[in-house]
Amino acid sequence: MEEILVFRTIIKHMEKKDVVGKIVDVIRTSFEQDGFKLKAPNKFEKRKGDSLYIYEISVTKSKTHFSLHLRLKLQNKRISTGVNTILKRVLKDPLIKYPTNFTDKVIEDIFKGRTSNKDVYGLTDWRFFKADEQTLSDFNAKFSIWFSNFETLEEKNNWQTELLQSVAYAKSWFALIDHDAYLIKHTDYVALYLLKKLDDIEGVEAKYKEIYDRKRSLDQDTEELELFYKYLLQEH
């Protein structure tokens, strides 16, 4: 009982910034050795050409514990601006119907949110790094800090080792995905935009069919996709 009270006292007096600070202290050197810089209290960033690599530490606090979620993001202004320019035309098209109970402000907020997104690709589920021959339980036993709850970081065995492993994973992920070919294979609107910029019209048509067929198989609406395809082909 005394131990529980001690933990609750610690949580009460610790803030999210304290947890973030401890994490930053562990991983900072490893990131800085590879050109990343701490650009915000919870974000390491590295610019490479037109791309921006982001490692984000998201911490939330409840009455009983902290929750940690590590996220990776790839931003590319050239690509996101191109996609968002087309998306603005799509979302203003009369064929796009919003629920009747949506106010003008809600619709405008949706429009702004959708068309100001700078992220080209991202990772939130770090089970991506599980080896094919590795069981999920084995992977989780060795690396689970990416999405975890705790009263203090210290209660989690090997928390520092796992954080350093997350840095290694992050670096390998950015090296893997920051290529047009990878993005074309693993994205939708970004892929269509990149193929159009490459003047690969056959590729655009094939990718569009792939996305369309997938959405139909999942019984998802295709109106927005069809409009994106239409306006994309009008781009010069």
Whereabouts are the PLM-identified features?
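N-terminal amphipathic/basic-hydrophobic helices that include classical n-h-c signal peptides
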Residues: 1-13
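Intrinsically disordered, low-complexity regulatory regions enriched in serine/threonine/proline
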Residues: 7, 15-20, 46-236
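Amphipathic alpha-helical segments
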Residues: 16-40
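Generic recognition of long tandem-repeat/solenoid scaffolds
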Residues: 39, 43-47
